[in-house]
Swiss-Prot record:
It is a single-pass membrane protein. It comes from the Eukaryota. The keyword NADP applies. The keyword Amino-acid biosynthesis does not apply. Its EC number is 1.1.1.102. NADP(+) binds at L10, L18, D131, Y220, K224, S253. Its main location: endoplasmic reticulum. GO terms for biological process: 3-keto-sphinganine metabolic process; sphingolipid biosynthetic process. The active site is at S206 (proton donor), Y220 (proton acceptor), K224 (lowers pka of active site tyr). It comes from Candida glabrata (strain ATCC 2001 / BCRC 20586 / JCM 3761 / NBRC 0622 / NRRL Y-65 / CBS 138) (Yeast). Keywords: Endoplasmic reticulum, Lipid metabolism, Membrane, NADP, Nucleotide-binding, Oxidoreductase, Sphingolipid metabolism, Transmembrane, Transmembrane helix. The chain crosses the membrane at residues 324-344. This is 3-ketodihydrosphingosine reductase TSC10. NADPH binds at G13, S15, G17, R40, K44, D131, L132.
Amino acid sequence: MFCLEDQVVLIAGGSQGLGKQFGQKYWDESRHSKIILVSRSDVKLRNAITDITGGRQEPVELVMPEVAASEPSASGSSAINLSKSSNHAGFESELRSNSNRSSSSLKESTNVVTHLTTNAADSRIVYIACDLSDPDAVERMFVTLQHNNLLPTQVLACAGGSIPKLFTDLTAKELEMGVKMNYMTTLFVIHKAAQMVPQAHLILFSSSTAFFPFIGYSQYAPAKVSLKALTSILRHELPNTRISCVYPGNFYSEGYVLEEMSKPDITKSIEGSSYPISCEECCDKIVWWLNRGYDDVTTDSIGWFLMSLDMGLNKHNNNSAYWFVQWLIGVIANLLVVPFYMVLCSYQINKWHKQNKNKNTLL
């Protein structure tokens, strides 16, 4: 149901964390798959490929073509317009049309990409440095993939990150970063993939906080809830496309270490027994469930239980492990367990507020 072999896999957020771990898994467990790592940082991507391959392969970059300044996109910056291209033929037609209108600039940039085709063809793993929160950059990325015959068969939208703080302690920049990292990066990649390669397997990465958003995650959880909603909508609109959504719990990564530095004590208290698993174990669990045909995937028992409490209207197309048991648990727990837990949770939060109010009074 989910095969690592003979794929062209695009891993958004592939320079570190879970995305990098997926790159490692494809490298170790396949022989003929093409692996494309994408993130903003050229240096991190090069280091990731060196780590994944053990230094046995030089990092190969697919350089995105520039476009003529005379052809501005609707957003005001230069880009090749792919919005009307819903299949390969449409994409190629649009590309030819744009090439004719802006021949000098696009020809020069196309030569750059064509120059790299041989290296890309010989490499099992390549990278593209791209700001995935910029829709124009995502369009140019797909131009690059098309030129190199690397349109993906699987898309893993792993990009994201959390800055756990109280809402009023967050800066406007951090809030903006949360929306860009955790929603827009996935939105634009999945949107373009759905237009260009509707037969590709689309895998979105949300979070177990999407089932239970709580204090300390205002920069992160709302975007992850949005991805859960987006998944439900896409399953309505794209019935012939396999669309999976992963809801990981805590796992060790570079991002997790940084999160613990800013995470409020009350957030840690409510998280309680949600102990982080290794990044490798998290990756293995996701692949294990996807391989068995499940498309709503959690990585720990707490995430699975929280999902069972969320079997709402859009869950008619839910495809998670033991979904009927989840439904039964959800009915019982929502009636008998959740009310008591929410009283306890409210008590913890109110107690924390009073303690902090007293501290501020003393100061």
